[in-house]
A protein has these predicted regions:
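Conserved catalytic SET/PR domain of SAM-dependent protein methyltransferases, capturing the structural core
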Residues: 1-132
Length: 132
């Protein structure tokens, strides 16, 4: 299991909270993080929305199972265009984050949470994009 935190830093950004930034250049396709997870069976997934942990769960597989990522990965914010993708590593029980593009030092790491803008605003407090 690899932890590549020397490439990253966490900063507090007004209006967003904690955010993960590249501390140095990260090449497209590079493994950025491989964080351990806590598995949450699908049968318990309805309860996560009723706790503060609910904002930090990720889809683990196609069977509606979830996981809590233990590391910087849980602090990566929603944003478009996203610059990292997620891969569930079932063998090592880790969530892996890969660079979708070259990421410059100082850029925030972002991925698409996959929710509609109403849910992003209501649940996560992310403002809806401006309508032209």
């Amino acid at each position: 299991m690899q932890h590549l935190h020397s490439n990253l830093e966490v900063r507090v950004v007004s209006g967003k909270g904690r955010c993960v930034f590249a501390a140095r250049h990260i090449a497209k396709g590079q493994l950025v993080l491989a964080d351990p997870i806590i598995f949450v069976p699908g049968s318990e997934s309805d309860h996560t929305d009723q706790t503060s942990v609910g904002r930090y769960v990720f889809q683990w597989n196609e069977d509606d199972d979830l996981c809590v990522v233990l590391g910087y990965g849980s602090l990566i914010n929603h944003g478009l265009p996203e610059n990292v993708s997620l891969v569930s590593n079932y063998k090592d029980q880790t969530m892996e984050f890969y660079a979708l593009t070259d990421i410059k030092a100082g850029d925030e790491l972002l991925y698409d949470y996959g929710h509609d803008s109403e849910e992003l605003t209501g649940y996560y407090g992310i403002p809806s994009p401006a309508v032209a």
